[in-house]
């Protein structure tokens, strides 16, 4: 099984894979799921998937949850799909590991 994230130490950037469920009761990251032998963090978002509302809420939620600037979070793949790749900029590896370990159960 591959990891659901990759870290580039020279650029201090990370790519994370998410399986997003919009129109949920609450915003929540809950462990991970395997789809076609690929792991994804499960992310529930309250916003509906219309006109970019869910994508905007994903960025807002991750920035608040992880105490990062919104400008350091970017959806780079899956804008109109539930499987998304998100780029996190300006993050050190220790902080990323702390984030990741808080969701692995």
UniProtKB/Swiss-Prot annotation:
SUPFAM superfamilies per the UniProt record, alphabetical: YggU-like
GO CC, one annotated term: cytoplasm
Pfam families (alphabetical): DUF167
Transmembrane segments: none
HAMAP family in alphabetical order: UPF0235 (MF_00634)
PANTHER family from the UniProt entry: UPF0235 PROTEIN C15ORF40
Annotated family: Belongs to the UPF0235 family.
Protein name as catalogued: UPF0235 protein RPR_04990
UniProt organism field: Rickettsia peacockii (strain Rustic)
